[in-house]
UniProtKB/Swiss-Prot annotation:
Compartment(s) where it occurs, according to its Swiss-Prot or TrEMBL record: Plastid, Chloroplast
GO cellular component, one term: chloroplast stroma
Family: Belongs to the 2Fe2S plant-type ferredoxin family.
Ranges of residues in domain 2Fe-2S ferredoxin-type: 3-93
UniProt keywords, alphabetically: 2Fe-2S, Chloroplast, Electron transport, Iron, Iron-sulfur, Metal-binding, Plastid, Transport
InterPro entries: 2Fe-2S_ferredoxin-like_sf, 2Fe-2S_ferredoxin-type, 2Fe2S_fd_BS, Beta-grasp_dom_sf, Fd_pln
Cofactor binding, note field: Binds 1 [2Fe-2S] cluster.
Species classification: Eukaryota, Viridiplantae, Streptophyta, Embryophyta, Tracheophyta
NCBIfam families per record: fdx_plant
Source species, domain of life: Eukaryota
Protein's name in the database: Ferredoxin
Primary location group: plastid
Role noted for this protein: Ferredoxins are iron-sulfur proteins that transfer electrons in a wide variety of metabolic reactions.
Annotated source species: Gleichenia japonica (Urajiro)
Amino acid sequence: AIFKVKFLTPDGERTIEVPDDKFILDAGEEAGLDLPYSCRAGACSSCTGKLLDGRVDQSEQSFLDDDQMAEGFVLTCVAYPAGDITIETHAEEKL
């Protein structure tokens, strides 16, 4: 399945189509978005985004706790879209 992912970045808003088997960070970079990252393995918080709408599958992440995930925080480097989503990027400082 292919879903619409709306990125809310410091540079503005952008919506792209992302298949359900592609990491959100990778898809955003391929679309030319300048997104933060470091480890690319779900083990740090550099790429953190805040999910404003929709659901993701980030079962491969190992950094966020259940409370942070319940608040909508997402590690974009290991998160797949599980439907149409809206995500605020550059959210590490809000953790």
